[in-house]
Amino acid sequence: MVRGPKKHLKRVAAPHHWLLDKLSGTYAPKPSPGPHKARECLPLIVFLRNRLKYALNGREVKAILMQRLIQVDGKVRTDSTFPTGFMDVISVEKTGEHFRLVYDIKGRFTVHRITAEEAKYKLCKVKRVQLGAKGVPFLVTHDGRTIRYPDPLIKVNDTIKLNLETNKIESFIKFDTSAQVMVTGGRNMGRVGTIVHREHHLGSFEIIHVKDALDREFATRLSNVFVIGEAGKSWISLPKGKGVKLSITEERDRRRALKGLA
C-alpha cells in the first residue's frame, strides 16, 4: 500500500521545458514543495548546472548553495531542488549577476540577465482578493504570497509591482484592454502582445484576444495571461525576440540572413 508523497521523479516524466536528455540517467531532480507548481517550475539545480553551467554535477551545486551565494527573490536558498518559477529573480552574489525567469517563444524558461536595478522588484499576478479574520483585507499572488491591506483598487488578474527589499507594493497595473501581457500557458506560451478584446462566457472560460508587435492576433484563456506593462511599455526587460513568434519560413529566412552576414 502506497503511503505519502512520491519522493522520486523519473527523467522521462520530467517537464519537457527542463530540456533534460533521456540518456544521462534514470532520475531527474524532484522539486521541493514551494511557491510554484512542480510542472511549472525550474529547480535551482537545473538552472545552475544545466543552464548556467556553473557546476558539473549535483554535489558541486550543493557546495555552491551551502556557501549561501544564491538568492531567489532576495532570500538565500540552500535547497538544490527549490522550485523557482515565472518572474522569480535569481541573484548570484560572487559574480554580481541577476536573472529573471521568463518564457521564450517556445514556452521554455530562458536565461535572461537583468540589471541590479531591475532585480530589486518583481511582478506578481493577483489570484485572489478577500477579507480575512477580523475583516482584514488581503490578496494572494501567483507565487503564493499573502499581502495584507492592499490598495482597494487592486482586483483579481491585476499585476502588482513588489519591492523585494521591503516586500511592499510599489504600484500596480489594471487588467484591461491595451495592457501589455505575456502568455504563460497554452500553445501561445511565451508570446507578448497587447490586449485587444475580452470575451465573456458565463459558466465557461473567458477568452482574451491579443495582438503582438507584428499585428498578428491570437486568442487564449484568461488564466493564461499575465500583465507585464501598460500600453506600449513593458515594466520588465524582455528576452531575445521580444515575445514575437515567427513562422517556420520566417525563422529560416532569418537564419539565412545571419549566415550571410557571417
Curated annotation (Swiss-Prot):
What keywords does the record list, in alphabetical order? Cytoplasm, Nucleus, Phosphoprotein, Ribonucleoprotein, Ribosomal protein, RNA-binding, rRNA-binding
Named from the GO MF annotations, one term is: RNA binding
The protein's superkingdom reads Eukaryota
Q: Could you give one GO CC term from the UniProt record?
A: cytosolic small ribosomal subunit
Asked if Cytoplasm is a keyword of the record, the answer is yes
InterPro entries per record: KOW, Rib_uL2_dom2, Ribosomal_eS4, Ribosomal_eS4_C, Ribosomal_eS4_central_region, Ribosomal_eS4_central_sf, Ribosomal_eS4_KOW, Ribosomal_eS4_N
Write down which residues bear the modification named Phosphoserine: S223
- Leader sequence range is none
What CDD domains does this protein's entry cite? KOW_RPS4 (cd06087), S4 (cd00165)
- SMART domains in alphabetical order: S4
Where it sits in the cell: the answer is: Cytoplasm; Nucleus, Nucleolus
Answer yes or no on keyword Cytoplasm.
Answer: yes
Pfam families membership: 40S_S4_C, KOW, Ribosomal_S4e, RS4NT
- Quick one: a GO biological-process term for this protein? translation
Boundaries of each S4 RNA-binding domain copy? 42-105
Subunit info? Component of the small ribosomal subunit (SSU). Mature yeast ribosomes consist of a small (40S) and a large (60S) subunit. The 40S small subunit contains 1 molecule of ribosomal RNA (18S rRNA) and at least 33 different proteins. The large 60S subunit contains 3 rRNA molecules (25S, 5.8S and 5S rRNA) and at least 46 different proteins.
Additional comment: There are 3 genes for eS4 in S.pombe.
Q: What does this protein do?
A: Component of the ribosome, a large ribonucleoprotein complex responsible for the synthesis of proteins in the cell. The small ribosomal subunit (SSU) binds messenger RNAs (mRNAs) and translates the encoded message by selecting cognate aminoacyl-transfer RNA (tRNA) molecules. The large subunit (LSU) contains the ribosomal catalytic site termed the peptidyl transferase center (PTC), which catalyzes the formation of peptide bonds, thereby polymerizing the amino acids delivered by tRNAs into a polypeptide chain.
**What family does this chain come from, according to its entry?**
Belongs to the eukaryotic ribosomal protein eS4 family.
The protein, known as: Small ribosomal subunit protein eS4B
Gene name linked to the record: rps402
